[in-house]
């Protein structure tokens, strides 16, 4: 018997405007409330006393009962903003803060942002005639992640003996911190001789801890 569900509640606000100086803005901000629940109850026996009678009481062995209960809550606030100036300069900014029930109280809140910029250099500066396009770009981004439920402190498990429980033998890290992946990217796009020759270059570095 398995009962598994996820409930999400979202709110989102958006803003868009264009200004006379050539600046275009798109922005949004919102939040999410997520709840997960997993309940599993299973029982099995080895062999049947009476063939064809599939009941726990008809097992040759004692019933092996397994119960798994997992619950998780994750609340989030986030924003994103995109700026474009005369289709020459571009800036994208995002940010998100999560509060996870699977982490210790002292580390339950974690924030991860991102910033990316790009510029069409041939629209900003005078370039040699063979160059049709020169666009440079760079970005910084972080992504956060929590863990599964009940990974930070010991808990009682079920036992085959009725009315009893098992003490966990694992030593848990009670200062468990969220996983943060940080990546950097830089590069450029070059098109020359009426787009007959092109070059794309990207440098990428990622670190997770």
Identify the meaning behind each predicted range.
Residues 1-209:
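Extracellular/periplasmic, surface-exposed regions of secreted and cell-surface proteins
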């Amino acid at each position: 018997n398995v009962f598994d569900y996820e409930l999400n509640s979202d709110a989102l606000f958006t803003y868009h405007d264009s200004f006379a100086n050539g600046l275009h803005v798109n922005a949004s901000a919102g939040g999410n409330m997520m709840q997960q629940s997993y309940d599993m109850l299973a029982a099995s026996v080895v062999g049947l006393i009476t063939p064809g009678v599939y009941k726990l009481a008809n097992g040759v062995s004692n019933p092996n009962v397994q119960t798994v209960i997992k619950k998780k809550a994750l609340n989030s606030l986030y924003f994103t903003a995109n700026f474009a100036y005369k289709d020459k300069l571009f800036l994208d900014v995002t940010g998100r803060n999560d509060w996870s029930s699977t982490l210790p109280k002292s580390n339950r809140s974690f924030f991860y942002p991102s910033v990316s910029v790009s510029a069409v250099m041939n629209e900003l500066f005078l370039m040699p005639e063979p160059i049709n396009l020169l666009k440079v770009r760079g970005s910084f981004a972080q992504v956060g992640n929590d863990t599964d439920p009940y990974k930070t402190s010991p808990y009682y498990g079920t036992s085959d003996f009725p009315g009893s429980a098992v003490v966990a033998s694992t030593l848990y890290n009670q200062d468990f911190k969220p996983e943060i992946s940080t990546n950097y990217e830089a590069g450029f796009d070059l098109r020359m001789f009426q787009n007959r020759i092109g070059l794309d270059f990207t440098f990428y570095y990622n670190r997770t801890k």
